[in-house]
């Protein structure tokens, strides 16, 4: 993993979302190890933190535009963190209503602090090339909460790009 983090950095990648369905494949220790490698390589990351008080979000000023990044995954393939785990993974727990509300509240709060909010979201069925109903509904909620850009991953195939309008537009 350390070599991969270094190679990503060398390739010009500066930010990664580690909230994916594979984030806990090697349990909490694997997640913490991954975060350590990313930190050593100088790669910013969203979606998880090595400690409960660590930040899972990231902001950066790019050309005078303050951009906030939030990372989440819809599921962790049935793996979960033990209640005593110190690390944090942002998950929606298979579109759980409370988890979605928490994410929308985070988007709204970040919108108050930044010029642009990008949500990096690992969701959708593998190899489905169409936007699913749950994805569409969540994307609209995020847009209404203030997300300017929603970057979806997880399906392993290209999906259509859509422009959404929020309720207040």
Task: Go through each PLM region and give its residues.
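Acidic, metal/ion-coordinating pockets
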Residues: 1-169
